[in-house]
Structures are given as structure tokens and as C-alpha cells.
């Protein structure tokens, strides 16, 4: 899902449409969607570099996987211009990927599989069984499912969990576990092969998958 598609979906929510009519005396149009997207882009570009801090554990896990010869590709709802800001800023903080694909010149973004396929071409990976899609949203899970690759969801720090680091630390453990269980259920319902609590579990999971494939 691209950012403009998310904005378009927001406008289509009944309550949002009602509020728009009450304020402007008319239904929204595609021009309103485009204008909102332009404003969103300006705000985003002004602050984008400030939000490129890697999630705890990401840098270490990427380094470990790369040392094993695993290539790291990314799919994103951001545009290429946005990623031209994000990638260098993230690299300065230790997070380096081998390839990044946006949906700019493809038939569609997540959950369609095209960005995964483009990554496979760019990174010269011939078999879908050698690809693992790791993500924190239902769209990520479905992208992996639609591409026919291993699809793995992560809970902590995810959009699906919807908690900041501070909220995660201060939330009563029982409530946190309950929320995590609901996210896990949603991800499996979307077709995930596996769901992990944190990215730290990913290397061990990949070892397990490799062992299963070797049987």
C-alpha cells in the first residue's frame, strides 16, 4: 500500500467523509486526496531524516545474516524520493541493506507481490523458496503470501502492535501479552508461516527453515 493509497483509504472512511461534508459542505474529490498527499509529502520530507533510527537489534541481525551470505532486500510504501533520504540516513546509523524497491514503476505496492519479485531480480535470487519476507504489518504478511515466499511477522515494535518503546516498557505485562497474542493471531490469520516476538529470533528461525528444506 502506497502512502497516497493510505490517504485515499482514510478519506473513504465513513466518519472522515461525514466530517469533511460538515466542514466543506460537499463530498471529497480526488483533487482533495491529491492536495492532502502534497501536504503530507512536505511535512514528511521536512522530518523524514529524524525518524531513521534502527529498531533495537536490527543492525546486529542484519550483520549476522549478511555474514552468512544472506542478501537483504527491502520493500516499502515510501516513494523512491523518500527512500533517497531514508537510506543514507539509516546507513549513517549502521543499518545497511543490499537493495530497496519501491512501487513507483510497478503495477502496485503491498500486498501485491511485485516488489518482492523485483528484489529477486535485482539480487539474482532465482528460487522463491530461498526468499523470506519479514514485516510488521498485515500487508507485509500478505505480500509474502502472494509472492509464494516464506512469510514472517514480527510483533514488538510493529505497526500492528501500535505501541511506542516507552508504552511497551510501562504497559502492565498482562495487558502487553494480551495485545501481542491478538497481533500474533491476526498475522497467522493473514497467512504468516511464522510470527516472532522480536527480530533477534530471525537468525535462528532461518536456520530452522533451512534445516526443514534440507530434509
Predicted regions and their residues:
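N-terminal helical cap/lid subdomain that shapes the substrate entry/recognition surface
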Residues: 1-59, 63-68, 84
Amino acid at each position: 500500500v502506497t502512502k497516497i493509497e493510505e490517504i485515499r483509504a482514510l478519506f473513504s472512511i465513513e466518519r472522515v467523509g461525514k466530517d469533511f461534508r460538515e466542514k466543506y459542505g460537499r463530498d471529497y474529490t480526488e483533487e482533495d486526496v491529491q492536495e492532502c498527499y502534497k501536504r503530507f509529502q512536505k511535512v514528511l520530507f521536512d522530518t523524514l531524516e529524524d525518524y531513521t533510527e534502527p529498531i533495537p537489534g536490527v543492525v546486529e541481525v542484519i550483520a549476522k545474516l549478511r555474514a552468512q551470505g544472506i542478501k537483504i532486500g527491502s520493500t516499502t510504501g515510501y516513494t523512491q524520493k523518500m527512500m533517497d533520504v531514508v537510506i543514507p540516513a539509516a546507513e549513517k546509523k549502521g543499518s545497511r541493506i543490499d537493495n530497496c524497491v519501491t512501487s513507483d514503476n510497478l503495477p502496485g505496492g503491498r500486498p501485491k507481490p511485485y516488489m518482492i519479485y523485483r528484489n529477486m531480480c535485482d539480487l539474482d535470487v532465482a528460487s522463491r523458496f530461498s526468499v523470506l519476507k519479514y514485516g510488521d504489518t498485515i500487508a507485509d504478511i500478505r505480500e509474502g503470501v502472494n509472492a509464494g515466499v516464506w512469510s514472517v511477522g514480527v510483533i514488538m515494535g510493529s505497526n500492528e502492535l501500535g505501541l511506542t518503546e516507552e508504552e511497551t516498557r510501562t504497559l502492565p505485562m498482562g495487558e502487553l501479552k494480551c495485545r501481542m497474542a491478538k497481533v500474533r493471531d491476526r498475522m497467522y490469520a493473514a497467512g504468516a508461516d511464522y510470527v516472532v516476538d522480536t527480530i533477534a529470533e530471525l537468525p535462528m528461525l532461518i536456520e530452522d527453515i533451512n534445516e526443514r528444506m534440507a530434509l
